[in-house]
Amino acid sequence: MQQSGQKGTRNTLQHAIGPVLVIAQFFGVLPVAGVWPSCRPERVRFRWISLSLLAALILFVFSIVDCALSSKVVFDHGLKIYTIGSLSFSVICIFCFGVFLLLSRRWPYIIRRTAECEQIFLEPEYDCSYGRGYSSRLRLWGVCMLVAALCEHSTYVGSALYNNHLAIVECKLDANFWQNYFQRERQQLFLIMHFTAWWIPFIEWTTLSMTFVWNFVDIFLILICRGMQMRFQQMHWRIRQHVRQQMPNEFWQRIRCDLLDLSDLLGIYDKELSGLIVLSCAHNMYFVCVQIYHSFQSKGNYADELYFWFCLSYVIIRVLNMMFAASSIPQEAKEISYTLYEIPTEFWCVELRRLNEIFLSDHFALSGKGYFLLTRRLIFAMAATLMVYELVLINQMAGSEVQKSFCEGGVGSSKSIFS
């Protein structure tokens, strides 16, 4: 009954994050076939001829064109903090789309290896609350992060609409509301094309897709890491059930083999996802540094103020979620090693000692291309770096609060998330 309870709810990574990946494909992210929750991992395929890949390539090429046009704006108007925003965003989106395109070719292999390892944790021996709630918990994480991203984008749109209204009223512009709105928000695009209503759906889709992929790098890593954490929690639960019992060598040998399978899967994640990890840490640090710089300047009206602080808070919470999700894996492994020491000395055997040696010798952590490990120590290191940066800004920018004239017009009149 327990076995059917776990398998009946299909608590696998494919089933858990399938709905999120289906949404992601609409925005050109991870274009692979067979990601529906009901599909078996064996049916996951990367296809060169598919609508999802076509959408991904269109958005990737569009990001490159957008980057080139944003570069022209910077060259024409100078390298300023308010002109480089769109360029920075385009460059980051190019890397995001590019990394996910590369990952999509490896995703069928990753999800099949994941499914093979997960069969172990669907057995009755691992039937606990972590296993039974695996899919629902991951989906809850996904929904919460996507809703938070939607709220952040909504505050951006609200701020942009309000500023567009103020520009027309206060600057006495003789312009159509929506035409002025899109020309303010996507100025670089209208360097090469004229505004017509037919462009609005395409502009909105590309804007939403670029915003989505900017968010999804962290969301995807959170889901993968939380899923891996719960598998370690299942193993911890099983060990704790027998911590006061003298178990035979065969029991600890089975645990050790399961741990090695889990460690191999973590090694695959480390190899295949390290590019995403480097990208996430890099663009999040850049964004937070830019926003800290802006916190010393006037943000304008109340809509800009609301968006600025909401966006900054959201990104900090998002990156902390990603960092804590990744660092929870080595932390859970460390907790298991602590539990092993609760076993009385007279109950120790050869296989238990071997199991303990694995926990002592392996770090069980994801890395960024081998340059750094995603542990709690890294979180404090990044926080310390940001604090030093803020102290330098406090010293350099005291009394330098300047607000650009609202009716200056031209480049920089809109509020990019990076400017």
UniProtKB/Swiss-Prot annotation:
Q: What tissues is it present in?
A: Expressed in Gr5a-expressing sugar-sensing cells.
Membrane topology listed for this record: Multi-pass membrane protein
Please provide the Gene Ontology terms (biological process) for this protein: monoatomic ion transmembrane transport; sensory perception of sweet taste; sensory perception of taste; signal transduction
GO terms for MF: ionotropic sweet taste receptor activity; ligand-gated monoatomic ion channel activity; sweet taste receptor activity; taste receptor activity
Q: Which InterPro entries match?
A: Gustatory_rcpt
Identify one Gene Ontology CC term for this UniProt entry: plasma membrane
Which regions face the Cytoplasmic side of the membrane? 1-15, 70-82, 161-204, 327-377
Q: What residue ranges lie in the Extracellular compartment? A: 37-48, 104-139, 226-305, 399-419
Q: Which Pfam families match?
A: Trehalose_recp
Q: Please give the start and end residues of each transmembrane region.
A: 16-36, 49-69, 83-103, 140-160, 205-225, 306-326, 378-398
Which keywords has UniProt assigned to this entry?
A: Cell membrane, Membrane, Receptor, Transducer, Transmembrane, Transmembrane helix
Quote the subcellular location field of this record: Cell membrane
This molecule's function is given as:
One of the few identified sugar gustatory receptors identified so far and which promotes the starvation-induced increase of feeding motivation.
UniProt lists the family membership as follows:
Belongs to the insect chemoreceptor superfamily. Gustatory receptor (GR) family. Gr5a subfamily.
What PANTHER family does its record include?
A: GUSTATORY RECEPTOR, GUSTATORY RECEPTOR FOR SUGAR TASTE 64B-RELATED
- Kindly provide the name given to this protein in its UniProt entry: Gustatory receptor for sugar taste 64c
The species this protein belongs to is: Drosophila melanogaster
Gene symbol here is Gr64c
